């Protein structure tokens, strides 16, 4: 059992001293626990510094190993530079006109989640049936989270493989979720997690992430003549024509 009144997370961390932590065949050796059967999801590279054992709300146990001296091969140079605009209708739109779908994993599972939560509310407190209902909800949340993480990892890896420099906007999701009409959609999109993945993977693979100031008027700027039209401050304007050169723009591609 995990016991920590100051931390809601169910986890503990052990430092590696000598060979008290090591990966075996279909098992991992941990201090005080010995060899514990497990499914190895990734090849362990480098020297192990510590192991963190955790349990998620659905009752599954995980071991995360912190390693050093692990070499990551840089990706081949492509010479490509793109800008990425994050959104809700499309998860992201690149400056070369490619729109990446927003799968809205939470929204797709909301009806099922609401049904399970209603069932939970009818169960007697402290009963085994209530624990089972709570576990079902935790497993659904885990499924939604895994879907989202899988998409973010695949998309971030793809963009870094295809481009040397990626420009992204310095968004402030914490401020944006104050809009209650968009809060759930913004949280479901996980823009901050996507940026985090891009930044650490870029460092791994020898690529570069450029963060653009959030007040830079990219949606108002004409890419043809560099003129600025303030009419796009109205978010309902999705397409506009530059009054200077007559070039037509999609606000997401700009």
What are these regions (language model features)?
Residues 1-56:
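Acidic carboxylate diad motif detector
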